[in-house]
């Protein structure tokens, strides 16, 4: 499993804020780990909730958990990582694996957050440039949340 250091924790917290699961407005009993897309909560962490939610006539989703993981991706990563449940620890493990597969972990570790966000934009619909037709946050807002969560951003001399 991929290690969680302070930089990675801050990036995960930023993602949860961006995805709307742990933003101070969405109801949650567990920092967003219990949120189904659309706002409903779940309590059974033995497996992904697998609830198909119609968000609008053109958009349906099975997104669930802190990082709004789709059930089809949960099935693949559960097997790949040997996960036993959909617990917070398992949700973090999947998110970190997805970030790793995009080559963004070293960027996060050294503070190149804008580049890491760009690398991960095809995974999370709320990131700038995702192109899923959903609301996308601005990079500056995401970087501010990353810093607020305790992350350090590498300053680039211009």
From Swiss-Prot:
Q: What is its main location?
A: host cell
Which Gene Ontology cellular component terms are annotated?
host cell cytoplasm
Give the result of residue 48 to N, as annotated. Answer: 97% loss of lytic activity
Location(s) in or outside the cell: Host cytoplasm
Activity regulation (record text)? Inactivated by zinc.
What terms describe the molecular function in GO for this protein?
lysozyme activity; peptidoglycan lytic transglycosylase activity
- The answer to whether keyword Coiled coil applies is no
InterPro entries, per database record:
Endolysin_lambda_type (IPR034691), Lysozyme-like_dom_sf (IPR023346)
Q: What is its EC number?
A: 4.2.2.n2
Function according to Swiss-Prot or TrEMBL: Endolysin with transglycosylase activity that degrades host peptidoglycans and participates with the holin and spanin proteins in the sequential events which lead to the programmed host cell lysis releasing the mature viral particles. Once the holin has permeabilized the host cell membrane, the endolysin can reach the periplasm and break down the peptidoglycan layer.
Q: How does it assemble?
A: Monomer.
- UniProt name for this protein: Endolysin
Q: Which organism is it from?
A: Escherichia phage lambda (Bacteriophage lambda)
Q: Taxonomy-wise, where does this protein's organism fall, top ranks first? A: Viruses, Duplodnaviria, Heunggongvirae, Uroviricota, Caudoviricetes
């Amino acid at each position: 499993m991929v290690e969680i250091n302070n930089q990675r924790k801050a990036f995960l917290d930023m993602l949860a804020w961006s995805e709307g699961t742990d933003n101070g407005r969405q109801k949650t009993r567990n920092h967003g780990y219990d949120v189904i897309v659309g706002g409903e909560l779940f309590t059974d962490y033995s497996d992904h909730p697998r609830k198909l939610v119609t968000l609008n006539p053109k958009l349906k989703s099975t997104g669930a958990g802190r990082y709004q993981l789709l059930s089809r991706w949960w099935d693949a990563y559960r097997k790949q990582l040997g996960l036993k449940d959909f617990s917070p620890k398992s949700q973090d493990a999947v998110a970190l694996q997805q970030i790793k597969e995009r080559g963004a972990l070293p960027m996060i570790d050294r503070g190149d957050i804008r580049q890491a966000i760009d690398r991960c934009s095809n995974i999370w619909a709320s990131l700038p440039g995702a192109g899923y037709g959903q609301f996308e946050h601005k990079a500056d807002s995401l970087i501010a949340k990353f810093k607020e969560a305790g992350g350090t951003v590498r300053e680039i001399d211009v």
